[in-house]
UniProtKB/Swiss-Prot annotation:
This is Pre-histone-like nucleoprotein. Cleaved near the N-terminus by the viral protease during virion maturation to form the mature protein. The record marks G23, A24 as: Cleavage. Plays a role in the inhibition of host immune response within the nucleus. Interacts with cellular nucleosomes and immobilizes the host immune danger signal HMGB1 on chromatin. In turn, prevents HMGB1 release out of the cell and thus decreases inflammation. Also plays a role in the wrapping and condensation of the viral DNA. May also promote viral genome import into the nucleus. Signal peptide: none annotated. The modification Phosphothreonine is found at T55. Belongs to the adenoviridae histone-like nucleoprotein family. Interacts with the core-capsid bridging protein; this interaction bridges the virus core to the capsid. Interacts with host NPM1; this interaction might play a role in placing the pre-histone-like nucleoprotein on the viral DNA or regulating viral gene expression. Interacts with host HMGB1; this interaction inhibits host immune response. The keyword Phosphoprotein applies. One of its GO terms (cellular component) is host cell. The modification N-acetylserine is found at S2. All late proteins expressed from the major late promoter are produced by alternative splicing and alternative polyadenylation of the same gene giving rise to non-overlapping ORFs. A leader sequence is present in the N-terminus of all these mRNAs and is recognized by the viral shutoff protein to provide expression although conventional translation via ribosome scanning from the cap has been shut off in the host cell. It comes from Human adenovirus F serotype 40. InterPro entries: Adeno_VII.
Length: 185
């Protein structure tokens, strides 16, 4: 008598009693059940010339599809909460930017204001000289003359002037520096 053992793919193979008990008719302590008498390849190892139609790309596609099927949308957040959060974040960012700007800005020293005034005056004189020269002479000579006059103005401004500086209140009551001595009243 032989027994049909059917694995999950139902190919099956027959075992007679001689194969089952090592040649004995019944099982005994001398003839225990024989589990495996030789190497057995795993199921699906020998396909008898049938070539697998699947590739590694198919596996990747299957995994992507499985991930997409398992995907659940995140719980919708309250729009009021999100608006409040964004307003708070923007306010913090604005405060940080303002703090950074305040740290960077320094009050100009007297030397800086004087240098700025010298530069402004030299530019004004240079522009005036350029206009004057352009009206009367050729452009090349005018440019050279204007440059010469501007250089002279800068040099004269750079030299320290003699004389005292007096602080006088103007019409609005603000104290301003003046070189000429105010009249005694």
């Amino acid at each position: 008598m032989s027994i049909l053992i059917s694995p999950d793919n139902n190919t099956g193979w027959g075992l007679c009693s001689a194969g089952m008990y090592g040649g004995a008719k019944r099982r005994s302590s001398q003839h225990p059940v024989r589990v495996r008498g030789h190497y057995r390849a795993p199921w699906g190892a020998y396909t008898r010339g049938v070539i697998s139609r699947r590739t590694t790309v198919d596996d990747v596609i299957d995994s992507v599809v499985a991930d997409a099927q398992r995907y659940t949308r995140p719980v919708a957040t309250s729009t009021v909460d999100s608006v409040i959060d964004s307003v708070v974040a923007n306010a913090r960012r604005y405060a940080q930017r303002k703090r950074r700007l305040q740290r960077r800005r320094r009050r100009p020293t007297a030397a800086m204001t004087a240098a700025r005034a010298v530069l402004r005056r030299a530019q004004r004189i240079g522009r005036r000289a350029m206009r004057r020269a352009a009206a009367s002479a050729s452009a090349g000579r005018a440019r050279r003359q204007a440059a010469r006059q501007a250089a002279a103005a800068i040099a004269s401004m750079a030299q320290p002037r003699r004389g005292n500086i007096y602080w006088v209140r103007d019409a609005s009551g603000v104290r301003v520096p003046v070189r000429s001595r105010p009249p005694r009243s």
